[in-house]
Amino acid sequence: MDVDNGEGQVQVHLKTKQEHYAVPDVPYAIDGTVTTVELNTFVNALLRQKDGSSDTDFDFLVFDEYLRGRLCDHLREKAISFEDAIEIEYVERFPAPEPQDCLLHDDWVSAVKARGKWILSGCYDNTLNLWTNKGKHILTISGHTAPIKAVDWISLDEETGRFVSTSQDQTAMLWQWNVGSNSVECVSVCKGHERGVDSVSVSPDGLRFATGSWDTMLKVWSAELDDAVEGSSKRMKESGVRTPKITLQGHRESVSAVQWMDATTLLTGSWDHTLKVWDLSLEGIKTEISTNKSIFDASYSKLNRLILTASADKNLRLYDPRTNQGSVVRNTYLGHNAWVQTVMWSTTEEFLFVSGAYDNQNKLWDCRSPKAPLYDLLGHGEKVLDIDWSNPKYIVSGGVDNTVRVFKSRKALAEEAETK
């Protein structure tokens, strides 16, 4: 057997956590040059022998990484002996998201957030827009005096929606939307930053929100409607002006990303090449991770407790904030052809995330597949500025082509199939 050339056979065990797809747990001898194509054929043949199953598309994990070429090359790259019995895990392939809608705006769409039946977008023409997730325009909201940079929902029920927006006009604005009358009012203007406000995130309980700015500051504000700012003048209270509860200094350049990790912990990413984890109970930095690029966006997963970054190059990077080796990258994801502007973990699928870049493309990834995305989500004609997967049914993105693109994910596709 000429193992060095990947010829000959390899002993494998085929495993799956999806019990209805399980095959007999015995060693199989397969050619070392197989790819996912041949493995799919082999597994489906075994399933037909077992119970007459129709063919299913699978992906294959070998040592916790998706197989994307020949098995022998994969093993050689990981320095795995060809003499060992190899365990291959197979999983049903995640279906390709399908394009649903293109929502036309009057200017660049720099911020987008979906919740329930609704999509909130923010534009460079200083306006916010509300849409249904079926593509119907509901409302245009004016108030900011410079381009919108970020948006987030505070709360939503059948009668009322509340959300926050941030802008290059150095403010954040709190809004209350009456769903029935389709009217909206600005409840508070949040002042305290000295430059544009680039990022925003609402706390898990909806009582606070955090903002990051070009002034390098991280600020935490009350999101409660009846909040009275201690020490504020009567004029400020009556005019709805709100000031921050906490101001945290530590970054040296723009705070381009902010996210609540839990009720008392915040993650920030910055153009100063660092990620910081903040402990609000101590009002200080808990962990700092140094990177080698400016960070445009960062996303933390509550499911796997890992952090992804989008940076001033073509790559996405994965970090573990729990490690003692703060600068070590756990994985790098290659696939975009220009700067990656935006990234977000799935809120329901532990291994999946989406990204958008200046190459006009969105991509859907599995964090166990660093060499290639699962799918390209095409449609934008210009740079992608923001992407959101808050609603598990829909992947939503905004870009320089003045559009919001809506893609149906597996949950929406499954619901459609059930109703047919």
Swiss-Prot record:
Protein name in UniProt: Ribosome biogenesis protein WDR12 homolog
Function comment: Required for maturation of ribosomal RNAs and formation of the large ribosomal subunit.
Region ranges (Ubiquitin-like (UBL) domain): 10-92
Entry superkingdom: Eukaryota
Pfam families the UniProt entry points to: NLE, WD40
Origin species: Drosophila melanogaster
GO terms for cellular component: cytosol; nucleoplasm; PeBoW complex; plasma membrane; preribosome, large subunit precursor
InterPro entries (alphabetical): G-protein_beta_WD-40_rep, NLE, WD40/YVTN_repeat-like_dom_sf, WD40_repeat_CS, WD40_repeat_dom_sf, WD40_rpt, WDR12/Ytm1
WD repeat start and end residues: 104-142, 143-185, 192-231, 250-288, 290-329, 335-375, 379-417
GO molecular function: ribonucleoprotein complex binding
Family matches, as Gene3D superfamilies: YVTN repeat-like/Quinoprotein amine dehydrogenase (2.130.10.10)
Swiss-Prot/TrEMBL GO biological process terms: maturation of 5.8S rRNA from tricistronic rRNA transcript (SSU-rRNA, 5.8S rRNA, LSU-rRNA); maturation of LSU-rRNA from tricistronic rRNA transcript (SSU-rRNA, 5.8S rRNA, LSU-rRNA)
Main localization of the protein described in the UniProt heading: nucleus
The entry's keywords: Nucleus, Repeat, Ribosome biogenesis, rRNA processing, WD repeat
Subcellular location: Nucleus, Nucleolus; Nucleus, Nucleoplasm
Similarity comment: family membership: Belongs to the WD repeat WDR12/YTM1 family.
